[in-house]
Protein backbone atom coordinates (compact mmCIF):
# COMPACT_ATOMS: atom_id res chain seq x y z
CA UNK A 1 0.00 0.00 0.00
CA UNK A 2 2.45 2.65 -1.12
CA UNK A 3 0.84 6.01 -0.40
CA UNK A 4 2.49 8.91 -2.18
CA UNK A 5 2.15 12.67 -2.39
CA UNK A 6 -1.05 13.82 -4.11
CA UNK A 7 -3.04 10.63 -3.39
CA UNK A 8 -6.57 10.95 -2.01
CA UNK A 9 -7.00 8.94 1.19
CA UNK A 10 -9.73 8.16 3.74
CA UNK A 11 -8.82 8.33 7.45
CA UNK A 12 -9.46 5.12 9.41
CA UNK A 13 -8.20 6.28 12.87
CA UNK A 14 -11.42 6.21 15.00
CA UNK A 15 -10.28 8.86 17.51
CA UNK A 16 -9.37 11.36 14.79
CA UNK A 17 -11.48 14.46 14.14
CA UNK A 18 -11.28 13.54 10.45
CA UNK A 19 -12.40 9.90 10.84
CA UNK A 20 -13.87 8.64 7.52
CA UNK A 21 -13.11 12.00 5.85
CA UNK A 22 -11.19 12.19 2.56
CA UNK A 23 -8.04 14.28 2.32
CA UNK A 24 -5.07 14.72 0.02
CA UNK A 25 -1.56 13.54 0.96
CA UNK A 26 0.69 16.60 1.32
CA UNK A 27 3.92 14.72 2.06
CA UNK A 28 5.35 11.38 3.14
CA UNK A 29 8.39 11.28 5.45
CA UNK A 30 10.75 8.35 4.91
CA UNK A 31 12.97 8.86 7.99
CA UNK A 32 11.14 6.25 10.08
CA UNK A 33 8.90 8.42 12.28
CA UNK A 34 5.69 6.97 13.74
CA UNK A 35 3.24 9.16 11.77
CA UNK A 36 4.99 9.91 8.46
CA UNK A 37 2.03 10.85 6.24
CA UNK A 38 0.80 14.46 6.31
CA UNK A 39 -2.79 14.74 5.06
CA UNK A 40 -4.48 18.04 4.14
CA UNK A 41 -8.26 18.46 4.35
CA UNK A 42 -10.73 20.99 2.89
CA UNK A 43 -12.40 21.80 6.22
CA UNK A 44 -10.72 22.91 9.44
CA UNK A 45 -11.05 21.42 12.91
CA UNK A 46 -12.01 23.06 16.21
CA UNK A 47 -8.46 24.18 17.16
CA UNK A 48 -8.93 27.92 16.51
CA UNK A 49 -8.58 30.76 18.96
CA UNK A 50 -11.80 32.11 20.43
CA UNK A 51 -13.39 34.63 18.08
CA UNK A 52 -11.06 33.80 15.20
CA UNK A 53 -12.10 31.86 12.12
CA UNK A 54 -9.88 28.96 11.21
CA UNK A 55 -8.18 25.96 12.71
CA UNK A 56 -5.95 23.14 11.53
CA UNK A 57 -6.52 21.51 8.19
CA UNK A 58 -3.57 19.07 8.26
CA UNK A 59 -2.71 16.08 10.42
CA UNK A 60 -0.10 13.30 10.50
CA UNK A 61 -1.10 9.65 10.17
CA UNK A 62 0.56 6.24 9.92
CA UNK A 63 0.10 4.45 6.58
CA UNK A 64 -2.01 1.72 8.21
CA UNK A 65 -4.52 4.38 9.38
CA UNK A 66 -5.23 5.46 5.80
CA UNK A 67 -7.14 3.91 2.92
CA UNK A 68 -6.54 4.97 -0.68
CA UNK A 69 -9.66 6.33 -2.41
Curated annotation (Swiss-Prot):
Pfam families in UniProt: PSI_PsaE (PF02427)
Membrane topology: Peripheral membrane protein
Gene Ontology annotations of biological process type: photosynthesis
Compartment(s): Cellular thylakoid membrane
Main location group: membrane
UniProt-listed InterPro entries: Elect_transpt_acc-like_dom_sf, PSI_PsaE
GO annotations of cellular component type: photosystem I reaction center; plasma membrane-derived thylakoid membrane
Domain of life: Bacteria
Keywords: Membrane, Photosynthesis, Photosystem I, Thylakoid
Its biological purpose: Stabilizes the interaction between PsaC and the PSI core, assists the docking of the ferredoxin to PSI and interacts with ferredoxin-NADP oxidoreductase.
Family of this protein: Belongs to the PsaE family.
Name recorded for this polypeptide: Photosystem I reaction center subunit IV
Organism, scientific name: Prochlorococcus marinus (strain MIT 9211)
Record lineage: Bacteria, Bacillati, Cyanobacteriota, Cyanophyceae, Synechococcales
Gene from which the chain derives: psaE
Amino acid sequence: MAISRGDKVRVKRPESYWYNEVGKVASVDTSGIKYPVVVRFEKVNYAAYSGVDGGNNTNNFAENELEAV
